[in-house]
Every structure is written in C-alpha cells, then in structure tokens.
C-alpha cells in the first residue's frame, strides 16, 4: 500500500498546517526520512525527481532571500520542477509568499509547522522511516522489559511463549510472538508484530491466546527498539556450550547488520527464566548506561584479595 503525504498530515495534523497544494495530498512518498534541497538550490541542476519529503528551514530561507527576485524565482522553480512529494516549512522559514506564488504552476503540497528542523527529524522523519522501512521476519518473542526491547530466541518448544506469559504477569509489555517483523532504522532495530499475529500468543497445550483480551490493552506495545537478544538453550540435551562465567565480555548477535548484545541462558528445571531475563536486562543497562561491569568488579576484587594474601 502506498504511503502518501496525506498519511503524514493525518498523523501529525496537530502540528501541521496545509499552506498550498491540498488537492495533491495523495502524492506518494517513496524514500524514508526528510531531505534538504542542497544540490537543487545551491548546486548544478538536478534532473531526477525528488522522492522524499523535503524540509525548508533557516538555511534555505536565508539563501533564497539573499538573492534578487529573479534569481529567487529561478531557484525556487528549479526545486518545484523536480516534483517533490511535499515541502515542509519549519518555524525558521519566515515568509512563504514567494514560494506559494511559484507553486501555482506545480501544485506541490506545502505544509508548515511551528517546529524546527531537528524536531521534525525526530518526529516526522522517524515516522516516515518506520513506514517505509524494509521489514524481514524473524522467529522469536518480543517483549519490553524496563524500557528495553528483548528479543527471545531459541529452538521450537523451549518455552519462549511461556516466558513471555510470565513477564506479562510481572507487568512487562508484550509486542509479538512467533513471527517478528524487524527493520533497521538508522542505527536501531525496530521490531513489531505482523498483521496476522498482532496481539496473539501461542502457548503449547492451551493454544492461541489474545493478550489484549486477557491482560488489557495497557500490556500491549505496538513496536519496540530491540536492545538485547536472549537465547534460551536446553542444557538437558547435553549439548556442549561455552557459557559466560564472569560476564566481563559482551557477546553480540548481528541482526540486519547491527550488533545487538546477546545473552545465552541455559534452561533447566528449577530455573526461573523470567527472572534470568530481568537480570540480563539490568546487567545490560548497568554496562551501557553506567559503564559498570559486575564481572570486572569481581575479578578486580579477587586479584586484590589474592595479592594481599601473598
């Protein structure tokens, strides 16, 4: 399904005002993010159509208003001739009158906002990138624990969905089960359910359950930034594996060309998987946000003790 200028306006109607080109709001946006018309205004003529939403801010306004009326008209028409799907004017673009005058021939949708360029990138730019991102399907369960997206993976039947149910009872958030749509957006991984499995989870022996009906809509998250991968391994199969002992070194798993911290947890009777996952998330936050490594702390204390004994 095509992603149009109207989709942006409908999503951000509170902060956007249609200035011109309302009859062309069905124009399709094909490229993610927001672009600035550097070459189109400042450089040699570009002949390729612009396929992304274009932002005009203080830089563009200062340049255009520094030109003579004839040059300003020429440069503005050069941009409009490339038929960008939409122009979004920031708070810094003070006077759009000449832009509207040139646009009579081209009918490019022009939206204005009371926000600055960096604010638009965070809100509208990120929204466009999410909508146009290429998602691939990965097998697992995605939940959010302490604000961190946790992708739980492991062989079929190991208990990933059961762990997710335990986490729900602990008031953590559910994103998706079984088929996870994952896309790279900038340097982040975003995971979400597919249209088919949204809000559903499969628990062996019970069947398909509707998480929203059972626990309430407040336990559902539409998507999550994947911060950590937790892999469950059944050690009862007697498969050799070099498990982490001190936790000094962080393992990583590469998903969509992004390295994600990877914790491998052995599963056996008597071990509460949900509590282990909580501990893994807390350990991640300590290492990443506080630069504290429990393993390093322990080893340092151990060597100090041994040196003292000698």
Swiss-Prot record:
Q: How does it assemble?
A: Homohexamer.
Keyword list, A-Z: ATP-binding, Carbohydrate metabolism, Kinase, Magnesium, Metal-binding, Multifunctional enzyme, Nucleotide-binding, Serine/threonine-protein kinase, Transferase
Could you say which enzyme class this protein belongs to?
transferase
Select a single GO molecular function from the record's annotations and give it: ATP binding
Gene3D superfamilies reported for this sequence: HprK N-terminal domain-like, P-loop containing nucleotide triphosphate hydrolases
Decide whether keyword Magnesium is in the record. yes
User: Mind telling me what this protein is named?
Assistant: HPr kinase/phosphorylase
Annotated region Important for the catalytic mechanism of both phosphorylation and dephosphorylation: the residues are 201-210
Q: Which organism is it from?
A: Mycoplasmoides gallisepticum (strain R(low / passage 15 / clone 2)) (Mycoplasma gallisepticum)
Cofactor(s) it depends on = Mg(2+)
Residues that coordinate or bind Mg(2+) = 161, 202
Domain statement: The Walker A ATP-binding motif also binds Pi and PPi.
- Catalysed transformations (reactions): [HPr protein]-L-serine + ATP = [HPr protein]-O-phospho-L-serine + ADP + H(+); [HPr protein]-O-phospho-L-serine + phosphate + H(+) = [HPr protein]-L-serine + diphosphate
Per the record, the gene is: hprK
């Amino acid at each position: 399904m095509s992603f149009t200028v109207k989709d942006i306006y409908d999503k951000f109607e509170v902060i956007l005002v249609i200035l011109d080109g309302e009859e062309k709001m069905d124009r399709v946006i094909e490229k993610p993010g927001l672009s600035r018309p550097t070459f189109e205004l400042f450089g040699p003529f570009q002949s390729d159509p612009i396929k992304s939403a274009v932002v005009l801010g203080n830089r563009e306004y200062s340049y255009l208003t520094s030109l003579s009326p004839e040059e300003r008209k020429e440069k503005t028409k050069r941009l409009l001739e490339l038929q960008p799907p939409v122009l979004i004017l920031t708070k810094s673009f003070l006077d759009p009158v000449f832009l509207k005058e040139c646009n009579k021939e081209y009918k490019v949708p022009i939206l204005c906002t009371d926000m600055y360029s960096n604010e638009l990138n965070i809100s509208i730019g990120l929204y466009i990138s999410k909508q146009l991102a290429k998602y691939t399907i990965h097998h697992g369960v995605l939940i959010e624990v302490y604000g961190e997206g946790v992708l739980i993976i492991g062989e079929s039947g190991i208990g990933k969905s059961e762990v997710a149910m335990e986490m729900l009872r602990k008031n953590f958030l559910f994103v998706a089960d079984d088929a996870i749509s994952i896309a790279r957006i900038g340097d982040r991984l975003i995971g979400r359910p597919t249209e088919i499995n949204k809000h559903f989870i499969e628990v062996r022996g019970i069947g398909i359950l509707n998480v929203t009906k059972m626990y309430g809509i407040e336990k559902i998250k539409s998507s999550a930034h994947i911060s950590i991968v937790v892999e469950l391994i059944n050690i009862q199969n007697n498969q050799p594996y070099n498990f982490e002992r001190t936790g000094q070194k962080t393992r990583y798993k590469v998903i969509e060309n992004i390295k994600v911290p990877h914790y491998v947890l052995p599963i056996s009777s008597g071990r509460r998987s949900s509590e282990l996952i909580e501990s893994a998330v807390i350990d991640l936050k300590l290492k990443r946000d506080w630069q504290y490594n429990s393993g390093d702390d322990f080893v340092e204390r151990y060597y100090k003790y041994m040196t003292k004994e000698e």
